[in-house]
Amino acid sequence: MLGRDEDLVRTMSGRGSLGSTSHRSLAGAASKSFRDVFAPPTDDVFGRSDRREEDDVELRWAALERLPTYDRLRKGMLPQTMVNGKIGLEDVDVTNLAPKEKKHLMEMILKFVEEDNEKFLRRLRERTDRVGIEVPKIEVRYENLSVEGDVRSASRALPTLFNVTLNTIESILGLFHLLPSKKRKIEILKDISGIIKPSRMTLLLGPPSSGKTTLLQALAGKLDDTLQMSGRITYCGHEFREFVPQKTCAYISQHDLHFGEMTVRESLDFSGRCLGVGTRYQLLTELSRREREAGIKPDPEIDAFMKSIAISGQETSLVTDYVLKLLGLDICADTLVGDVMRRGISGGQRKRLTTGEMLVGPATALFMDEISTGLDSSTTFQICKFMRQLVHIADVTMVISLLQPAPETFELFDDIILLSEGQIVYQGSRDNVLEFFEYMGFKCPERKGIADFLQEVTSKKDQEQYWNRREHPYSYVSVHDFSSGFNSFHAGQQLASEFRVPYDKAKTHPAALVTQKYGISNKDLFKACFDREWLLMKRNSFVYVFKTVQITIMSLIAMTVYFRTEMHVGTVQDGQKFYGALFFSLINLMFNGMAELAFTVMRLPVFFKQRDFLFYPPWAFALPGFLLKIPLSLIESVIWIALTYYTIGFAPSAARFFRQLLAYFCVNQMALSLFRFLGALGRTEVIANSGGTLALLVVFVLGGFIISKDDIPSWLTWCYYTSPMMYGQTALVINEFLDERWGSPNNDTRINAKTVGEVLLKSRGFFTEPYWFWICIGALLGFTVLFNFCYIIALMYLNPLGNSKATTVVEEGKDKHKGSHSGTGGSVVELTSTSSHGPKKGMVLPFQPLSLAFNNVNYYVDMPAEMKAQGVEGDRLQLLRDVGGAFRPGVLTALVGVSGAGKTTLMDVLAGRKTGGYVEGSINISGYPKNQATFARVSGYCEQNDIHSPHVTVYESLIYSAWLRLSADIDTKTREMFVEEVMELVELKPLRNSIVGLPGVDGLSTEQRKRLTIAVELVANPSIIFMDEPTSGLDARAAAIVMRTVRNTVDTGRTVVCTIHQPSIDIFESFDELLLMKRGGQVIYAGTLGHHSQKLVEYFEAIEGVPKIKDGYNPATWMLDVTTPSMESQMSVDFAQIFVNSSVNRRNQELIKELSTPPPGSNDLYFRTKYAQPFSTQTKACFWKMYWSNWRYPQYNAIRFLMTVVIGVLFGLLFWQTGTKIEKEQDLNNFFGAMYAAVLFLGATNAATVQPAVAIERTVFYREKAAGMYSAIPYAISQVAVEIMYNTIQTGVYTLILYSMIGYDWTVVKFFWFYYYMLTCFVYFTLYGMMLVALTPNYQIAGICLSFFLSFWNLFSGFLIPRPQIPIWWRWYYWASPVAWTLYGIITSQVGDRDSIVHITGVGDMSLKTLLKNGFGFDYDFLPVVAVVHIAWILIFLFAFAYGIKFLNFQRR
């Protein structure tokens, strides 16, 4: 590394070259230069001719320049307030600035970011130019680039249980070339070529599925491994193998993955810390040397800034402060990012955080994928303006894909790349793009955004309206024709001529391409990851406290169950209870590690993103987690042993106490490591939970307690030695039973052992030599190291499961292009002007037109803790202030405001979707006070987050919504016709059989999902529709389709209100009225828009100081620009107050008053029933959806059946024919152990795997319940019914395997009893898992509760300690353990009627029936009662699940 740095410095010295600060090193901005602030004129304190002060400053600079390089680059001169109150320059350590100093410095250089950023960047550039330092530049070329993917044909693409099984078998056979592949190739990018130049900002446009994301990923070296790429990509003539593309460039994904527990600032600081400073330090060294030689003194604040950002490994950096200001995130810098559990930043802020995460690094080529989703047009414009300044001043290479760029944003770009159907339609200067399309015969109309025109002109459905050659008849111009036309156009020919001249590699700047894999040293990477892990642990401290409390409670229970007064010593029978106590301790310390599984899976998405961007190596992520859990592991082990060791009455020796502590600690460490590894291996909750339970099962069963080593089939003995549990169990029993108090002589001549302790060890096949204790400790530590190593390997090589490609059914024999966005048939996408509402077809079902009026609406939430910590006073935070407005039938209203203005909050309040907070004010529906129960029946709410059941198709989603929300008197045929009509309207017919999927994982794209959200509400035939950002995340064409749908809906007489972020001119002017809000939740305009927004423009232009709108400018963007807080402060006005006093508001108040009074002869809304459909139909519809959801969820059900077969066969082999021979006590123990394991582990697997499945559907349930689709009870019943259906089949498979392999009696009665108890057992376990999800906020807490109560059930199952031996004060709980009833039923029904003789060590012979009755309390005549109790358990868990679903709502809105 040092050698490379010296080369760079030498190159700079020789050529005057080393690159500037890359685009982030040029961070910061300047309001006034230091010299401007402290120049001599007038009253400046430094302006007087006092030579002493000037000399003092000169001396300080001279002293600074004489310091060694290392120290000099860490010292800067900043103005400080002296003791006498004067301001003077003081030298400061720039690597250790206090937050106040950082803020002061940022204020000096970047007071008003909108105005000062460009000045500041120029000052940075001027500093490097002044001494002749050249900036590194990157030119990216791609030649003949093609990308292909595999796709399954027809309905085999749907992930049903059947299809996945067949596809898996085919894939396995295909690996061995036994079967040809059934997949076919699909072209995503088709032989494209182009050049991306530095210092020019390029806009990537194209309809959805045109290949934009694939192109950006290919250029950034981030292409999915499952795709095949051909062609060539070079950076400055160098191919990817010659440098590290992930460090040379930065790819900004459209998916926002962040840790919800960290604040915005912490997230950016961590990013900046890991990505490093690139060549900033070498630049500064050379810059400082040259300035000293030339006698140049830099601006002190610029010098301090550049020095501060050039030092790598800092925990916090000024780059973070700069990026926070640049992206407008400084207002939420110390707010948690948030997740499903925590309230955090808004969607728009999250999107900007994703952008900022890569901006804080040193990359000089940036590929940004849809960075404007969820942002208003004003914010998008500002960010793109700052990016343009960065590109032009710092010579950065940048490509940005945007969905709906406003005209003013579009004009910021220098070059355009237009993609369609995987082909390049145009690439070149923005100035020539309209000329090209005119050359092809198409013209962009006036008042039409060029970007919108470009995305529509290649579409088959929209092209004709732009045809300009009236003398020639129109015929469709295909994408291929456009592409060929571009090659003959002058811009295409110029591009071809540039390609003929290869890039001169010799001109490549040595700092342009990065060859080091990571940005900082391994030590600094480890420290950064360690600090973050510690922070995440502190933020999740509740879970760790909960775990510690859990283990404390379990240890208290263990010590009271195995209380020393009940624990006698000296005989073999006494030893059996100690075995149970030791095994139970072991189980708890193992189970306590299972929470690590959920944590690991939860953190993987962010890890995979950061690993692929080379933030850090996998070991740096893994090791801190391992090291920080050691103290926790020790605490848990100490708590357990401190509470249980002497109270249970283990060997009193102090040495044995500490040896048992060591064994517990090693077992806990091994368990944590194992579950971390399994989490990384499984990667999803369902697979990881299944794998975790299977691993537990294997290590437990082979641990030596459930089945003796001597009874394991000889060919499976190797499994015994590979079970970590065996070593933990061996260490504990050797430590206990080789103590002198177990040294009484053995009287049983059939066992070759001297003492009772040795008899106890040998009877279960354990070793009797003391040195085995240390061998076992060594083995446990070895397993800990092995599992951590495997964890790192899994993190290194495995990729996330699932991908973002939609599962769309492609019919064989039909030509379907991925990337063509054209549906079948349909009219041109044109938004109907507001002045001519002709009659519309569609939406013909009868409905009642309703108005909504609201006044003086205020909304408060409890003051967030982080704001209180910052000194904000008050108990409540007000989000809406005296908001008033009216929405009428047939009138389309836009609700507009910048991010944080309270648009979604207002909509949630009006729609009755808030679950918390305090609402004040009046809300009336057609003059009557709003009643939420009836309002839900007549309203629809299209949420911003597009929440749908992931495992059903688009058509099924719509049929389901219509089935439950349309009134019962509409017949099936009419309902289906209506659904077809809505699908036609929203252009969903081509996606009819597509799986919906999970956002960002699989299934529908963002815009397809958005259209589905709208369609789901439209099929309900509502009178009032709320739409929260219906065009967010859509390209211009998709937005136009959506808005045409909305317009058509309004024209049928419905009341529609939409929040909207970045409307184009034609979208904005399709609205009739506007409610404009500013930050703080205040209204600043409420009224009609007028033709071409005339009334809106007149209102704001009448306010003194507001700049006039330019011709052709988007009124929506202009309106947001002139009402920003900075404009308010510049003009010294309050737009909210101006509106309150305006005539527009008086008219608004009159309208509100009019609509708040019921019309004469009208009646309030009334429905005979709360829901549209009766109880039976609700249940039937819910069951129908649940059935298809489960059938198409192979991750859940295929894993469930695979686990059933694997566990069944494993137990069958381990306990082969144990049911036929029960001759001695150990045979009965093995038989009991077989049933105990068979019941507990597969039951626990069912409980664990059902939880994530129920949790996903619960989010959908909250939306559907709020929409008034059904009661909670039919939903609960149907979900349970589907699970019971699968449990029935699962039990059949399991019973046949176990019953035949273990060797039970083949009689009808015994087989029925076995099947019955197994079935009811699996059902209550599944219901128990579902119940915990319904009663807890999320499935992570549900998982912790599950393991906690499973420990109870396990302890009191009757296996670890038989019922007659349980102390009297705990015996009642035996009857409260469902597992105990199941074991009672199975064992008694199979062998409880046998009179065969069993030999008991140390006691003698006894009949099996008597032994079961006296030793275990099992009575054959009690079986019918046991059978009834199983039904009771199922009903208890069913009612608890239904209660949780009906009455508990953990959604926070």
Swiss-Prot record:
Which keywords does the record carry? ATP-binding, Membrane, Nucleotide-binding, Repeat, Transmembrane, Transmembrane helix, Transport
Q: Where in the cell is it found?
A: Membrane
Q: Which SMART domains match?
A: AAA
Where in this chain does the entry annotate a coiled-coil region?
none
- Please classify the protein's predominant subcellular localization into one broad category: membrane
Instruction: Name the InterPro entries for this protein.
Output: AAA+_ATPase, ABC2_TM, ABC_trans_N, ABC_transporter-like_ATP-bd, ABCG_dom, ABCG_PDR_2, P-loop_NTPase, PDR_assoc
Residues reported in the UniProt entry to bind ATP 2: 897-904
Binding residue positions for ATP 1 = 206-213
Q: In which tissues is it expressed?
A: Expressed in roots at low levels.
Entry's CDD domains? ABCG_PDR_domain2 (cd03232)
- Induction remarks: Induced by cold/dark treatment, 2,4-D, epibrassinolide (EBR), sodium chloride (NaCl) and cadmium (Cd).
Q: Return the annotated region ranges for Disordered.
A: 1-24
**Which ranges carry the ABC transmembrane type-2 domain?**
524-737, 1177-1391
Record domain ABC transporter: where: 173-446, 852-1105
> Has the keyword Transmembrane been applied to this entry?
yes
Membrane topology listed for this record: Multi-pass membrane protein
GO MF, one annotated term? ATP hydrolysis activity
Q: Where exactly are the transmembrane stretches of this chain? A: 542-562, 582-602, 621-641, 661-681, 687-707, 773-793, 1196-1216, 1230-1250, 1289-1309, 1311-1331, 1341-1361, 1366-1386, 1422-1442
Gene Ontology CC annotation, any one? plasma membrane
As for family, the record states: Belongs to the ABC transporter superfamily. ABCG family. PDR (TC 3.A.1.205) subfamily.
Q: What does this protein do?
A: May be a general defense protein.
From the Swiss-Prot or TrEMBL record, give the protein name: ABC transporter G family member 34
Q: Which organism is it from?
A: Arabidopsis thaliana
Taxonomy of origin reads: Eukaryota, Viridiplantae, Streptophyta, Embryophyta, Tracheophyta
Gene name, please? Answer: ABCG34
